[in-house]
């Protein structure tokens, strides 16, 4: 149940309007939280290759969404990466 609450909290924090669940900002924020959680898991379980593959897929999806947002609206992109603390 905690995972659902964390996801809903992330959606509330990054949504662009009421009822927004699918904007690039929300999707990137959810992926970033999942990536951070999975990274912690992999620090403890170094040989969990199935989870590592899932992590790489999530990182790729986040990269594509960020690239899309950067092309579509640079200001929203810059705001998002600063709020999430991403290095780009």
Swiss-Prot record:
The keyword Zinc-finger does not apply. PROSITE patterns: RIBOSOMAL_S15. GO terms for molecular function: rRNA binding; structural constituent of ribosome. Disulfide bonds: none annotated. SUPFAM superfamilies: S15/NS1 RNA-binding domain. The keyword Ribonucleoprotein applies. Residues 1-20 have a biased composition (Basic and acidic residues). It holds the Pfam family Ribosomal_S15. InterPro entries: Ribosomal_uS15, Ribosomal_uS15_bac-type, uS15_NS1_RNA-bd_sf. Keywords: Ribonucleoprotein, Ribosomal protein, RNA-binding, rRNA-binding. Residues 1-25 are annotated as: Disordered. GO terms for biological process: translation. One of its GO terms (cellular component) is cytosolic small ribosomal subunit. One of the primary rRNA binding proteins, it binds directly to 16S rRNA where it helps nucleate assembly of the platform of the 30S subunit by binding and bridging several RNA helices of the 16S rRNA. Belongs to the universal ribosomal protein uS15 family. Part of the 30S ribosomal subunit. Forms a bridge to the 50S subunit in the 70S ribosome, contacting the 23S rRNA. This is Small ribosomal subunit protein uS15. The gene is rpsO.
